[in-house]
C-alpha cells in the first residue's frame, strides 16, 4: 500500500518533493537520494554544494561513498560541505578520507574537518 506523501520542498530541477508520512521507506525518498547523489557531479559548483548539504540533512548511509568521492572536488566549498555532510551521517567509513583531506587543507578548513570527525566519533562511540 502506498503511503500519503507530505511536501517537504518545492520541486527544483525535477527533484521529487515528498516523503512518507509514517517515516517508512518511500520511493520518493529514494528518488530524492538518487537525485542529490547525481547532483554531486553537476557542472555547477553551487548545485554540488547544495546537494552535499541536502544529503547531510537526509543522513542516509547510502550517500557516504559518493560524499567521500566529493571530498576531492575542485571547489573547496563543496569539499567542506561534503565533510560536514559526512559528519552529519556519522558513518565510520568517512574517518580515513576525512583525515587525508585534513592534511591537504588550510587551518580554517581543518577546523570544519575536525568537527566532522568529532561528530562521527560521538555518533559511533569512538574515541
Predicted regions: what is each one?
Residues 3-6, 26-39, 60-72, 91-103, ...:
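Amphipathic alpha-helical scaffolding segments comprising HEAT/armadillo-like alpha-solenoid repeats
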Residues 4, 11-13, 22:
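Asparagine/serine/threonine-enriched low-complexity, disordered tracts
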Residues 8-16, 41:
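HEAT-repeat alpha-solenoid elements in large eukaryotic scaffold proteins
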Residues 43-44, 74-75, 105-106:
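Short inter-helical turns and helix N-cap capping residues of alpha-solenoid HEAT/ARM repeat scaffolds
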Residues 51, 82, 113-117:
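Conserved hydrophobic register position within alpha-solenoid helical repeats
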